[in-house]
């Protein structure tokens, strides 16, 4: 197996809401990513930890919201998260609760009947709709600006021939998808990213799909065709990832040669980030320590078959010398 790690770049596009100052936010994400890798393959975790420059954060949130939050708000909860080795019975029970199942049903109905969205009881859902509309309708040019924040490092990496893992969490997966579409169909950049990894993604929602760049087209411009592989991870209890089966919505990308594979991982996926409000199955920190996410990152880093690299039973392939 060839060691290509010197050209590996991990680009992370966060989800909505104000984030900590970029350096502090990056440190928190990096901590969680490495912890997830430690749990599936300590050797790979050590190798990646020795190359911190490989991890690039796209800090679009201050551009969009005009403010930042304090890193101290999340720090103790992230430390608690990283001291665990997986979800416990309470995490699983809460993720599978009838309350979550009922909320999911209501959101599915509203996704097909958008006029019902203002009637939903969860204010977080309403705010998410308002914020996504600001992005989709490019109010004050902000949509184009946040896509440019993603495209700028991607252009440089693609030109350098780097292997790119593009991770999009939540609304960040929408921005990443649209940025790839523009690189392909507007800028006509012929290069491809190696892996798109979407976490807690709303791309399965009809409301979102109707507003994606190119999605309504029925010609060769409908999808970005610069993604070698796509892995989507969706956790139980994450209501933002309303439909976890993205292959059913984007399967035409396979037929059109736009990507080599689309894999949905949602069976037995339980994130376990908690704060003072209880379990939050959607937070990016929880996804980064989760085993399905970590195995995808580890296998990509090595350019290896995932079953050989870091199988679920914990045995692992030795790092190349």
Where are these regions (language model features)?
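Lipid deacylating catalytic domains
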Residues: 1-60, 65-69, 107-167, 173-321
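N-terminal accessory regions of S-adenosyl-L-methionine
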Residues: 60-62, 67-94
